[in-house]
Each structure stands twice: as structure tokens, then as C-alpha cells.
Design a protein with these regions (language model features):
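A structural supersecondary motif
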Residues: 12-17, 36-75
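C-terminal regions of mature proteins
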Residues: 105-177
Length: 177
């Protein structure tokens, strides 16, 4: 926990994916991150922001090269315990296979649309390929999209099962006791 002169608390839960970036299982880990916290149909957005009205924003981000997934939200500092419990519940739900067809399809569509949009921007395409330079094999965006389409819900559940909580960080108000 860290205190600063802020009005919103920032809660981060850092998970190790335990999935090497060159593994074919990486695509399932990527979809796991999308289902957890990318887009308006993600579990964090629906449950923390919409259903419980706790967060100004709630999202997740996967860093392929570092093998980490961050789940994070901006909240009223008094809501830390509830928000942290809800994040943990959403990760557990994915581990337990509680992934709806809508969540799965929205995640696949979001990732595939992102990959398709790379061709519209030289800087995005450059950034994508720069990230690929550290890989044993370079997958172009179309190939990456094909791999995403091959991932099953069961693969995502297995990827979530490999994740381990590593770090909990909370930036809070100096006034919060």
C-alpha cells in the first residue's frame, strides 16, 4: 500500500500467467485476460463497474513477454476490500469454467478486430512486429488471429488455472485511515 494526495484509490492485482510467450498456450492466456478485463463485456467491467458500481474503471492487461496479467481498478479507497474480493472472484469464475458464450465470442471478436486494425496504422504494425522480435517464431497478425480462433473455453480455463497471484498493490489517499 502506498499513500499519496489522490482522491481515487488504484488497486492492482498482479498474476503470473506461468505461460511462456512462445507456448501455444499463450493464446488461451491472452483470451483469459480479455474475458477478465478488456471491453464492456469483460467480467471486471460488468461486475465491478456496472453491477456493483464500485469502480471508475476496471480492466486487465496481459504482458506476454513478462508472463504477467494485471487486473486493476480505480475505486473509492473505502471500497478496497470489496473490490479486491470481486477481482479474485472473477478470476476464480474463469478458473471454474464460468465463461458464457457471449463472453467468449466477445473476447475472440475484440482480439481479432484489434489484430485486423494493425494494418490501418504503421505505428501499430511496427509496435506489433517489434514485440514479435523477441519470439522464436514471428506470427503475423493474421496468423495470430487464426491461433485465437482455435482456442476453446477449456483452453482458457486451463490458462486461468496456471495463473498465480503474485502482487497486490493499492495506491490510496493520504486521508484514508
Amino acid at each position: 500500500e502506498e499513500k499519496m494526495n489522490v482522491t481515487q484509490g488504484k488497486l492492482f492485482l498482479g498474476y503470473r500467467t506461468n505461460t511462456p510467450p512462445e507456448s501455444s498456450d499463450y493464446y488461451a492466456a491472452a483470451l483469459c485476460g480479455v474475458i477478465l478485463g478488456q471491453g464492456t463485456q469483460s467480467k471486471l467491467f460488468v461486475n465491478i463497474r456496472e453491477k456493483h458500481s464500485l469502480a471508475y474503471y476496471a480492466a486487465a492487461y496481459t504482458n506476454k513477454m513478462k508472463g504477467i496479467l494485471f487486473a486493476f481498478c480505480a475505486i473509492d479507497p473505502k471500497d478496497r476490500a470489496v473490490a479486491e474480493a470481486l477481482i479474485r472472484e472473477q478470476v476464480a469464475a474463469i478458473r471454474n469454467g464460468e465463461i458464457t458464450t457471449e463472453e467468449y465470442e466477445a473476447a475472440v471478436k475484440l482480439l481479432r478486430n484489434d489484430l485486423a486494425s494493425y494494418g490501418d496504422s504503421q505505428s501499430q504494425l511496427l509496435q506489433y512486429y517489434f514485440g514479435q522480435t523477441f519470439m522464436e517464431q514471428i506470427a503475423d497478425p493474421d496468423e495470430y488471429a487464426r491461433h485465437i480462433a482455435e482456442v476453446s473455453v477449456e483452453d482458457i480455463v486451463k490458462a486461468a488455472g496456471r495463473m498465480t497471484l503474485d502482487t497486490v498493490y493499492f495506491l490510496t489517499s493520504e486521508d484514508e485511515a
